[in-house]
Structure formats: C-alpha cells, structure tokens
Amino acid sequence: MLIELADFFDCSVDALLGYALRANDRESVGERLKMLRRTEKIDEGVAEAEKALKKYPNTFSVVYESAMTFDFAGMKRKDKAMLRRALDLLSHAGRLLPQNTDPAISELSIKLCMADILLEMEEFDRALAALKANNACGFLDGQIGHLLAGIRERREESVSYLSMALLRGLTTLIRVGCGFANVYEARGDTRSALDILQWLLTVLAGLKKPGRIGELDKISAILIAARAQLFYSSGDMDAAREELARAKALAADYDAAPSHKAANVRFYEGAETVNIYSELGSSAMEAAHQTFMGDEGTERQETFWQGVARPA
C-alpha cells in the first residue's frame, strides 16, 4: 500500500514515512514540554515551545502545553512578559478546544488557569472578575474568599465566600475520610480506619460552638458508631460498647433538640438561612443504628446494640 501511494504521489516511500512521522510529532511535542517543565529545564522548554508554535500554531495540544510552559517560566522568573504570552496562548487554546482529547482539560479549567496567571501578574481585579464569572455552585468560593481576604480594604467582603467554602470543605473532608475508612476496613487495616475516623471527630470537635447542639453532633454520633462497628467486627467488645455508649449519648442529645442551622458551626459567618444535613437517617439515633449494623448486621449484633444502655 505504501509503495502504491508513493507511486500515486510520485514520491519515495521514505518521504511518505517522513510525513507520517511529522504527523505523530505534534502529539509528542506536548509530552516533551511536560517533561521539560517537570525537570525545570526552563530555557529548553521555552525554546521548544517557540519552535513548536511555528510548526503547529493551531494544534490544541501544542498551544496549550506551550501556554503552560510560558506560565511556568513566568512564575519561576517573575517575568510578566512570559505570563502575558501564556495568557494569550490560553485564550487561543480556548478557541481550539474542539480538538482536545484530554478529559482533564475543559473550558472551565482553561479559564481558571487564566485567572491564576492574572493573580501571578498581580492583576487582582481581573482575576477576581474571572473567578466570580466561573463560580458555578460556589465551586470557587474558597479561592474568591482567599483573594478578597488578602486585600485589606475588601476583607469583610470575603466573609460570605469563606463561610460557604468552610461548609463545602467540611463536607468534602468528611466524605474523603469516610471513604478512606471504608478502604482501610476492606484491606483489613482496622487501625487506620479507626484513626482516620478519630481524626474527623477531632476536626468536628474544633468546629462546634460551645453549648450548642447542631448537625455536627449528629455527624459525630455517626462517626463514633462507625468506630464502634469496627471494634465490634475486630472482636474488641469492651471498646465497641464504650464507643456505642458515646454515640447513643450524643445522638440522644441531638434528637432532643435537632438543628440543621449552619450558624451552629464555629467560624461560619454566612447567611442565617443556610442549613446543613447529614445523609443518613431521619434521626441521629436511627443514623447511628444504621451505621453500626451496616448492610449485613446480625441478630447478635442487634442484641449488642440493644444491650448498650441508652442515656436516661
């Protein structure tokens, strides 16, 4: 087939193979630019990017990775000219986005990268406007709040953003911690599962307002019940009983005066109307029970639950 094509185009097989190699070359340019950034070969990376842009000025992967190279060089050397070049290239990459095959890169990720470059250039107003324009679902509240808090005359403006970011960050932390606990349990690493749950409990304790009952108490009861279940499964009945008593006491306190108000969370200073909810059970006691029993709870386990004294 190659010989037939060569005859058709009146060229040698070597020339045709060379064309195929050039077509593959643009795909390897991006990987080479990444490697040069990882090894901090800045001059070589910039030179490679300039050469690649002349050959492939409208290839997404080349334009995008060249932008990242100029961004890295500008950040390392505090060179605003390089940062401006990175900004221009990212803008061009946005227009070439239909060529992109990397699911980790999107219109949003490009815009956020541009906002980061504006921050590096100390163009705070433009960076702030870019972040606010792309803050779907409050995804960027933490970045916006952090930026505003760094501007002396705008610090109070940051509070609402920081408050919502605190709640979202806490939610993420709990999910990640519980996810790791499940992984450790499946591996048979009970100690690590217990430790990460205890770490979450320590974080929650630091966010409780003294004298107030709130959703963090319900979540804490669930986490303590999870620790009880781990102790029970590992055969440490005394520790399981102790943790279960703690979980029941906390759950009973919450159920006596349930509150979902975010205002019960320490450091939160956002809107009074914001509420937070846990995902298990209508009551804290029910949620603790579900957590302790799991999906394969036995009658013996239920008897153990019932045998732990419920607070009067």
Locations of regions flagged by a protein language model:
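Eukaryotic alpha-helical solenoid repeat scaffolds
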Residues: T190-A312
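Flexible helix-coil transition and linker loops at the boundaries of alpha-helical arrays
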Residues: G18, A49-S61, H92-E107, L128-A133, ...
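Hydrophobic micro-packing sites on short alpha-helices
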Residues: M1-L17
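Residue register of alpha-helical TPR repeats
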Residues: S61, S109, F139, R175, ...
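Alpha-helical segment of the N-proximal tetratricopeptide repeat
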Residues: R26-S61, E65, T69-D79, C113, ...
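"A position-specific structural signal for the A-helix of alpha-solenoid helical repeats
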Residues: E31, E65, T69-F72, S106, ...
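Helix-turn-helix repeat elements of alpha-solenoid scaffolds
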Residues: M35-A49, R77-R95, A115-D125, L148-S160, ...
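Short coil/turn linking the two alpha-helices of tandem helical-hairpin repeats
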Residues: A67, F72-K78, T101, A149-E153, ...
